[in-house]
Amino acid sequence: MVEKIDFVVAWVDGNDLVWREKKAQYDGSINTFKEGMNSEKSYREWGTFKYWFRGVEKFAPWVNKIYLVTDQQKPSWLDINSEKLVLVDHTEIICNDYLPVFSANPIESNIHRIPGLSEHFVFFNDDMYLTAPVEPIDFFSEDGLPKYVTALAPITTERYGTGHFQMNDMGIITSHFSKKEILNNGHFFSFKHGIKQLIKTLLYGTTKFICGFWESHLPYPLLKSTMDLVWEKEKAVLETTSASRFRSPSDTNVWLFKYWQIASGQYAIGNPKLGGLFSLDNAGPDFWKLLNSGKYQIMCINDGHNVQDEEQVMTDFVKAMDQLLPDKSSFEI
């Protein structure tokens, strides 16, 4: 049984004028192709981050430490004296030569450098909310392996999407593991992943090459030692990502470390019903009811790029979260 599990979450306040001025000094380095990958929506702050902390305190009180990774920022409501909270600045984990960075990819690639971080930790994006009780066994097996639901699936090729990063991640994986090794190690042909994922694997397992891994967009249980290992084997690539001030098609991302666990067989199969990915593009009365229903323990609520009435959606989002998590957490002033 894993004794200590930490949570790590990265956050940026895109409304902060000091941060915006700093970013503006480097915006000229963004070429036309990269503009779509680094739009204002990538940094938008909806004012819902306090509910992330409320969810953790209510639904995962067993967590050891929470490491909040920021760029010299902190939410105005945050109690920095909270016993479980540790603020981590980018300067503590990323080489000064590469700073400042305005992309999640360099940050995610260096989170294992957080001073004091436990071997077993779960990395969250700030749009991944706990919405019902979770236990350590939801993230790690009794013998300490990270738990994932996966499948063989093609990589989605959107011009400004994450497919570029996933292609780079998988290129590294397939350079270290053969198709035979991946299929033998990966536990893909198991009903435990869920019937939908098994069907994907059966469809794409017959191709000549590994086409990609299905991505759940849920929090990432990771091992610090695995990140060290991948850095040891792919230092040049990861240094390039670390030096990428803005999102670039040449980047890798945090999925690389998860994929390494899968390809090497160093993972256990998770619960396919643990959570889901949702977009605010489709937010309406039914979605807000779902958020409060307890059907999912974890919900990744993505900002989306086609929200029609942003002000109304933001109001409804905050209202729904306040219904689910009305009480202040110990992390709030």
UniProtKB/Swiss-Prot annotation:
Q: Name one GO biological process term.
A: polysaccharide biosynthetic process
The EC designation for this entry is 2.7.-.-
A Pfam family per the record: Stealth_CR1
Q: Which residues form a coiled coil?
A: none
Q: Which InterPro entries match?
A: Stealth (IPR047141), Stealth_CR1 (IPR031358), Stealth_CR2 (IPR021520), Stealth_CR3 (IPR031357)
The entry's keywords: Exopolysaccharide synthesis, Transferase
Gene Ontology terms for molecular function: transferase activity, transferring phosphorus-containing groups
Superkingdom of the organism of origin: Bacteria
Protein family: Belongs to the stealth family.
Task of the protein: Part of the type 2Gn receptor polysaccharide (RPS) biosynthesis locus. Essential for cell surface RPS production, and for synthesis of the host-like GalNAc beta 1-3Gal (Gn) motif of the RPS. Probably encodes a 1-3Gal alpha transferase.
Q: What other comment is given for this protein? A: The cell wall polysaccharides of some oral streptococci act as receptors for the lectin-like surface adhesins on other members of the oral biofilm community, especially type 2 fimbriated strains of Actinomyces naeslundii, allowing colonization of the human tooth surface. Recognition of these receptor polysaccharides (RPS) depends on the presence of a host-like motif, either GalNAc beta 1-3Gal (Gn) or Gal beta 1-3GalNAc (G), within the oligosaccharide repeating units of different RPS structural types. Stealth proteins are part of a protein family that is conserved from bacteria to higher eukaryotes. Family members were first identified in microbes as proteins that help pathogens to elude the host innate immune system. Microbial stealth proteins are involved in the biosynthesis of exopolysaccharides. Stealth proteins are predicted to function as hexose-1-phosphoryltransferases.
Name recorded for this polypeptide: Receptor polysaccharide phosphotransferase WefC
Organism the protein comes from: Streptococcus gordonii
